[in-house]
């Protein structure tokens, strides 16, 4: 390398390196305040039912256009983890700062710095302008590489950052190559863990539109297994994902072929939490609606015993749904009234 151009590249490299060193200083300075910040200021639970849940998710019809919907964000303006590059939660990094942060994330092996950098990137990815900038800077594979990390907290923070980045449809094109890996982590990792919830939330975001839903075909039975064994938060998050799939007629046969334990029908009992009960009722309704679209009717002999088809079309399921017409909650009763004619 020689001449003015070579000198310019050297100067640019030194400037970027200096900026990254400053990022390291700002991030590591947070250690002196104590690592407790990372634990206390946790991201919003991925499984918690939000107030004002989209009507489309609970009423058997889509409240979203074909290309958009209700996205699952891991950071809200009211409950953001601390942005450790500055003291303010509301500051938005510019493109140059984001580039330095991505360089730092890619070059450091310090787990504390990695985690803090991922939190900062995740916070900034909550803003639409930065979702595009991070993609254009090549940041998506840098963040996604951290879902391979052995540190579970780092893996979770990487998934959370991808959750916010996935709100951008163009970003999904780059994120989709990691769907299989995320599925493997979700179904092989600890039940009800933060990593599992973060992974389920990312899969939910990636299935808001129909574009990438087919990539989950081979994992549908696993989803139902997690649904039946997980806690309340996990159940709600799995159901959000299943509802996305159930609105797409192209996924109906795959859902009905899934092998599902008969304990699934217990989710239609009257004592089940409302946020779960409404969603399993909507799942039933969506599948029934899809079966009728353009004469797309299922033929019973094509489904094996033990499949979701046999559970939903059996008399036990019909009896449980009819019994809910006397449910104490008005929303549940209203939902049941609309479903009974379809039984």
Curated annotation (Swiss-Prot):
Lipid bilayer topology: Single-pass membrane protein
Function: May play a role in cell survival and cell growth. May suppress the transcriptional activity of p53/TP53.
Region called Disordered, residue ranges: 43-83
Expression sites by tissue: Expressed in all tissues tested with higher expression in placenta, liver, kidney, heart and brain.
Molecular function as annotated in GO: DNA binding domain binding; p53 binding
Cytoplasm found in the keyword field: no
Organism per entry: Homo sapiens (Human)
Quaternary structure and partners: Interacts with the DNA-binding domain of p53/TP53.
GO biological process, one term: negative regulation of apoptotic process
Subcellular localization, as worded in the UniProt entry: Endoplasmic reticulum membrane
Ranges for the ARM repeats: 138-180
Keyword Repeat applies: no
Phosphothreonine PTM sites in chain numbering: 85
InterPro entries: ARM-like (IPR011989), ARM-rpt_dom (IPR006911), ARM-type_fold (IPR016024), Armcx_regulator (IPR051303)
Protein's name according to its UniProt entry: Armadillo repeat-containing protein 10
Miscellaneous: Depletion of isoform 2 results in cell apoptosis while its overexpression in cells leads to accelerated growth rate and tumorogenicity.
Record GO cellular component, one term: mitochondrial outer membrane
Entry's transmembrane regions: 5-27
UniProt feature, compositional bias: Polar residues: 64-82
Disulfide-bonded cysteines: none
Phosphoserine modification, residue list: 45
Keywords associated with the record: Endoplasmic reticulum, Growth regulation, Membrane, Mitochondrion, Mitochondrion outer membrane, Phosphoprotein, Transmembrane, Transmembrane helix
Lineage: Eukaryota, Metazoa, Chordata, Craniata, Vertebrata
